[in-house]
């Protein structure tokens, strides 16, 4: 069980004499969930949802492979193709591999429809959430599949690959006059069987053996005679799986990155590839290497940001469409009902090569800010709040001897701190993690919420302590007081800047360090400092006036776009 925690976490727990087994059992761990969920978006009507529920209930003690085999056989019999040689081989191979047992099968199986995936839906419903999470195998709704395949035209001779095809959604939905031009790879033998069955049903007028290989696309070597042999590739690769692949192509621990890069190299020049990715590929630091790969090839031509979701997946997701080796000067972005174009230069604004999807007016504002800026927070002092290791034991709700107040992120508001609700005995040696004392005891410092999609900074000149839900900044910007820096960070313009450049749900030191600051004269510095004092000590609201000054500093005459 201990393998699911990091070495750093284990060291911290050892230091605090934590019972690791009890701690792990108390953690919410989706990978161990035994819950079953039916992905209803894959079916057309409620009758089939009820039928799947009945099958699961009646065959709750049966093995998954036995249930899938018998339902597949019923589907094939419904179309009168079960006696074809190629179909018999598919059934016999699966029967032999899984030692399929006969079932007293209950359930009236519907006729096959290319508009839904009954067999794949049943399989997903039979798998526990924990198993799907470990595999990263959540199948893609046809609505999204169809959108990703739009513009793919195989005709009679062009070929298509799905390198992690699951039950075959992309293979079923792409249009071709020759099913032998369709290729899929899937390492789950049950899913690969379903994909084969779905294809022979979808192309029941053809006598053929589907080109579905049951193997691991990343680990099992080369499946094809030569590189650059495919015209089209599209898929939804596993997300969240850490890859153990050692590749000469790219250095990454994310499996979806390896799926993409290996697929890209199997695509011919001029071929098209469309991948479904977690939205985090746009901005998270750990995905910088794949963004650099994409930028270097300069053939990404479309990003589609989806507002929908599908069963089992809470992560926001996007699709990226590439036209290999065809230079693209900009990238079309589709977002809800909006369409706009982003220049590749927008991907170079940050050190981590964040894909900032800026509309033209937004990019104009960003460029103006960058052109006026000469400083950053990179030379400032930073610290984390205290990690006690046991808040229940070490935090007190009332004051007492040797105790002092300690603030949490919940008490941080723009500019000011609410009253502290907790007290602590400041014994540095007893804490799991603690910063230098002179940081906490600084004459003045800024504190900010760490888990937030908003920049919320407060001023502290009371040398107070803070828990780790708050982080600490002692800024060093030439010509600016600490309070003036506070004014900039709490402004609408800097909120806009942070959102557009980084798009994070957390306020990270690395991102804050890159925020650009202008050179200002002493008059503006004094003016902003005075306004912050009026907020801190006079109870006045000076946000509007602060915003107006900062807009003027950057010569932005129409701030409505950032509000």
What are these regions (language model features)?
Residues 1, 267, 364-524:
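Polybasic, glycine- and aromatic-enriched phosphate-binding surface used to engage nucleic acids
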Residues 1-97, 137-138, 144-220:
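Charged, often flexible domain-edge or linker segments that flank or initiate folded functional domains
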Residues 1-11, 143-144, 165, 171-172, ...:
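Signature of N6-adenine DNA methyltransferases within the class I
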Residues 42-52, 116-128, 239, 243, ...:
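Active-site-adjacent bridging/hinge elements
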Residues 74, 78-149, 494-501, 509:
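Class I S-adenosyl-L-methionine
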Residues 122, 148, 195, 448, ...:
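Conserved hydrophobic/aromatic pocket- or pore-lining residues that grip, position, or stack substrates
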Residues 347-391, 410, 519-563:
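Non-catalytic DNA-recognition/assembly elements of restriction-modification systems
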